[in-house]
Design a protein with these regions (language model features):
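Exposed loop/turn and edge beta-strand positions of beta-sandwich/beta-sheet ligand-binding modules
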Residues: 6, 59, 104, 150, ...
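Transmembrane beta-strands of outer-membrane beta-barrel pores
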Residues: 16, 27-33, 69, 83-87, ...
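Outer-membrane beta-barrel channels and translocator barrels
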Residues: 15-19, 70-72, 113-117, 161-163, ...
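Gram-negative and organellar
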Residues: 43, 57, 85-88, 100-104, ...
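Residues on the lipid-exposed face of transmembrane beta-strands in outer-membrane beta-barrel proteins
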Residues: 8-14, 63-67, 106-112, 152-158, ...
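Structural signature of Gram-negative outer-membrane beta-barrels, strongest in the C-terminal barrel
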Residues: 118, 126, 135-136, 140-193
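Transmembrane beta-strands of outer-membrane beta-barrel proteins
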Residues: 21-25, 75-81, 106, 119-125, ...
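Flexible loop and strand-edge segments within Gram-negative outer membrane beta-barrel domains
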Residues: 2-9, 13-77, 83-101
């Protein structure tokens, strides 16, 4: 196999501890070309060689912003977003496979306590979007699909710092293709001394 690629990544960070703010912004671009197959020069029997090629271009970006209350350090808010664009053109022998995908994700989360730091909770919202366009040579079909999902969650955690810890939560999601659904969560851990 032979390959050549190019990657560039850049990330910036902002921190202000007096105000409790931290932020990140990042970008990445990748170009990758791969060739593989049989070496026709060393073949004893002349025939069509099996070859493959994968050419990929990808762009990613992300953003994160967080705030921790300087006067109440157990209380925080966070927000993040991510976007990616992926394009791939390829063939494997006589079969072609091409895909384009655009993805977006965002998340908002709030953390705090109930009474004391042994009783913590987090609540939040998230949204995701995926747009796929696939071409599969086997049946000469283009498959297009869009997935969109929005969700919310609440999670409570208790930690006695000695023997017992537990996490209980509930999540609600609505998906454009799968409908709406609830997902409960419960974990308990007991550690005798």
């Amino acid at each position: 196999p032979k390959s050549k690629g190019f990657n560039i990544f850049n990330r910036w960070q902002y921190t202000n501890t007096d105000k409790g703010v931290v932020g990140f912004l990042g970008f990445r671009f990748m170009k990758d070309e791969k060739d593989s197959g049989e070496d026709v020069d060393n073949m004893k029997v002349k025939r069509l060689p099996w070859l493959s090629e994968i050419n990929t271009n990808r762009f990613d970006s992300n953003f994160k912003l967080g705030y921790v209350n300087p006067k109440i350090p157990y209380q925080s808010v966070g927000f993040q977003m991510a976007y990616s664009n992926h394009k791939q053109e390829s063939f494997f022998g006589l079969r072609n496979y091409n895909i384009k995908q655009n993805s977006f994700y965002s998340n908002f989360i709030y953390n705090s306590i109930i009474g004391n730091t042994m009783n913590k909770f987090k609540a939040g919202l998230n949204y995701s979007y995926d747009d796929f366009e696939e071409f599969i040579d086997a049946d000469k079909t283009i498959y297009n699909r869009v997935d969109k999902s929005i969700g919310s969650f609440f999670e409570y955690s208790y930690d006695s710092l000695e023997k017992l810890s537990l996490v209980a939560g509930l999540r609600y999601d609505f998906h454009n293709n799968l409908g709406s659904f609830f997902t409960p969560r419960f974990h308990i851990r007991y550690q005798p001394l």
